Curated annotation (Swiss-Prot):
The keyword Signal applies. Residues 1-28 form the signal peptide. GO terms for molecular function: C-C chemokine binding. Glycans are attached at N41, N61, N64, N78, N92, N100, N122. This is Evasin P991. Coiled coil: none annotated. Disulfide bonds join C55-C77, C73-C114, C90-C119, C109-C128. Salivary chemokine-binding protein which has chemokine-neutralizing activity and binds to host chemokines CCL2, CCL3, CCL3L1, CCL4, CCL4L1, CCL5, CCL6, CCL7, CCL8, CCL9, CCL11, CCL12, CCL13, CCL14, CCL16, CCL17, CCL18, CCL19, CCL22, CCL23, CCL24 and CCL27.
Amino acid sequence: MHSTIVYACLLALAVFVALHGTPLAALAENGEGTTQPDYDNSTDYYNYEDFKCTCPAPHLNNTNGTVMKPIGCYYTCNVTRCTAPDTYPCYNLTEHQAKNLTTSPTTLCAVGNCDHGICVPNGTKELCFKAPNLEE
């Protein structure tokens, strides 16, 4: 008796599919659900610059409890030049000033905000210093 019920249900399903098609076939007739992403030529799925900029940007410490900030608004990650987002806080230091920083808070650093890769000073200064693990 049970096998008859299963057979009848399968037969009904087969007739339904034969008459109406599958839901995927209906989507294909409407032009939906059939396109595959072109992984070789598409940038819709990955921001390749973000993917290449996976190294942490070197940041400096400060004495007033605000967030640590990078020296300028760009850094190199492997061979990629990485840029901090606009309005990101930064220190506007010359290369000479940055090289002479120590792990003690002895340098008054100009604070700014990034704008298209440039640290634009905002008129404030704070003592900044290298984190002990900051590479040269």
